[in-house]
Structures are given as structure tokens and as C-alpha cells.
Amino acid sequence: MAALLGRDLLSLADISSTELQELLQLATQLKSQQLKLQCNKVLGLLFSKASTRTRVSFTVAMYQLGGQVIDLNPNVTQVSRGEPLQDTARVLDRYLDILAIRTFAQQDLETFAHYAKIPVINALTDAEHPCQVLADLLTIQESFNTLAGLTLTYVGDGNNMANSLMLGCALVGMNVRIATPDGYEPDSQIVEQARAIANNKTEVLLTHDPELAAKGSTVLYTDVWASMGQETEADNRMPIFQPYQISEQLLSLAAPEAIVLHCLPAHRGEEITEAVIEGSQSRVWEQAENRLHAQKALLASILGAE
């Protein structure tokens, strides 16, 4: 996929609808082993936040492509002692072929990408989580054999997942509804970006009513109510977010064929009930597996694997 060769992925707004559709097609081909690609490259993982799925899926994807992975824990690099990001970036780009960064501030990611000559991938920031949404869209496509015209409802905190889901859904022609408590809405600039991409052809709706949002939806999606770095707010958030739990009652308002997604880790009994996450409409485990296939497609595209 030559269009993404050598490019960064800092946000889903960085790619076109066509490029996103081609990535999903490549992920499907790689997953089914219709296509096997190889690249003799080195991926660096610079993660300031805890990670299970992102770390393991990127590592396995790179190994399966024939490449190598170096885990650059900031605590054992000079970053932890205050080395400027621009200095670290200009050193690492002389050793590595590509870098995936998981950090708090989107601005830090953008600084790294500005100074590094190698491609940089957003492996999660407080603002966006584009790689997760690649896997989400792949899972939805597998479930319905299409994306255009479907409706995804996200309930909970207007966090990085809500931001990236708005962009991803707009790019593939899906309607997206975001239901949050008052004061916990997604980033207003990203809302406007998503609406510009949708161009009045699909819906980008913000509401405080989870039942209204869920009604007739084909996908219900949630995430933790307190993200990494917000642990001290968890107890205060609990009563505020309780009406936004994906329960059997909320799921009953969705379309009969609706599926349920969660980016994990899940706090069962909080944002999602045990019955729903373990129920027949849950696609959470397929979604987690698809992190591997979606990110393998992304790496192969950026690195020009053949």
C-alpha cells in the first residue's frame, strides 16, 4: 500500500477514507493468510503508559513480518532523566526504522514526529487511540460485511477512544453517537474534524442521553470511566457515570443484531456488566485479536513490506 509508505500515523485524521479502507482490506488478507508480507526492519516501542494489548500485538505483528522489536521503557532511557524529546528523537531515528509511542500528551508525540525522520505511530495518547479504532472497524466489518450506513454508539467518558471513534466512523461512512455525562464530552476540535469529514452525509451526534443514543444502534461501545492518569477521580466519577453502563437493558434498545465492543481492560460491573461482556452479542475477544491484524497491516503499509 504505497500511499502510506514512510508516513506517520498520529491521528486518524492523517489518512483518507480510501487509505483507511485499503488498510482494513490488507488486514483482512493478512489475517486470512491470503497474503504474506515480509520486512527486515526494526520497530521501537517507547511506552510511558502501561500496556498489554498494544505492546504484545505490535511486537507479535513485527515478528510475524520478519522484523525485530526493541522495547524502550522510558524509565531506563535518558528520557526519564530529562533528555529533551527532540534530542531523543534525532538519535533514535538513526537506529530504528519505525517508532510506536504511547504517552500522555499528544503534543509530545507530535514533537517526536517533527524531529524524527522515521515514521512515528500513535500507540495511544490522552487525545487519541487510532490503532485501537483500526481493530474496531475491522471487527465491525467482519460482523456485518460492511461499514457504511451502520450506527455506532459510544457511552461513557468522552476520552481518547471517543475522539478516535468519531474520526474513524466518519471516514468509513458510519453514523456515530457519543453519549456522555454533562462536562465529559469529547474534544470539541475533534468533533468538528469528524463532522467536516462526514460532510453531512453521516451523523456525528453528541448527547447526554444514553438510551436515546443506543436506540437502534448496530454497535454499542464503551471504555473505562477513569483513564490512566485519572485514578484519583475514579470514586467521584462512579455515580456520575452509572447511567452510562452497558447493561442488558441498554443493549435491548439497540438493533436486534447489535454487537458490543470494549477496548479493554474492562471493569466489570462498572462501564459494562458481566452478562453483556460474556454474552452472545459481545465481540470483545475478536476485537482484541484484531489489534494484531490491523497493526500488522499498518506496519506493512508504512514500511513497504513485500
Curated annotation (Swiss-Prot):
Carbamoyl phosphate binds at S51, T52, R53, T54, Q78, R102, H129, P130, C131, Q132, C263, L264, R291. InterPro entries: Asp/Orn_carbamoyltranf_P-bd (IPR006132), Asp/Orn_carbamoylTrfase (IPR006130), Asp/Orn_carbamoylTrfase_sf (IPR036901), Asp_carbamoyltransf_Asp/Orn-bd (IPR006131), Orn/put_carbamltrans (IPR002292), OTCase_ArgI (IPR024904). GO terms for cellular component: cytoplasm. Its EC number is 2.1.3.3. It is found in: Cytoplasm. Keywords: Amino-acid biosynthesis, Arginine biosynthesis, Cytoplasm, Transferase. It is an enzyme of class 2 (transferase). It comes from the Bacteria. It catalyses: carbamoyl phosphate + L-ornithine = L-citrulline + phosphate + H(+). GO terms for biological process: arginine biosynthetic process via ornithine; citrulline biosynthetic process; L-arginine biosynthetic process. GO terms for molecular function: amino acid binding; ornithine carbamoyltransferase activity. Pathway: Amino-acid biosynthesis; L-arginine biosynthesis; L-arginine from L-ornithine and carbamoyl phosphate: step 1/3. Its main location: cytoplasm. Gene3D superfamilies: Aspartate/ornithine carbamoyltransferase (3.40.50.1370). The keyword Lipid metabolism does not apply. Transmembrane segments: none annotated. Coiled coil: none annotated. Pfam families: OTCace, OTCace_N. L-ornithine binds at N160, D223, S227, M228. Belongs to the aspartate/ornithine carbamoyltransferase superfamily. OTCase family. Reversibly catalyzes the transfer of the carbamoyl group from carbamoyl phosphate (CP) to the N(epsilon) atom of ornithine (ORN) to produce L-citrulline. NCBIfam families: orni_carb_tr (TIGR00658), PRK00779.1 (NF001986). HAMAP family: OTCase (MF_01109). This is Ornithine carbamoyltransferase. The gene is argF.
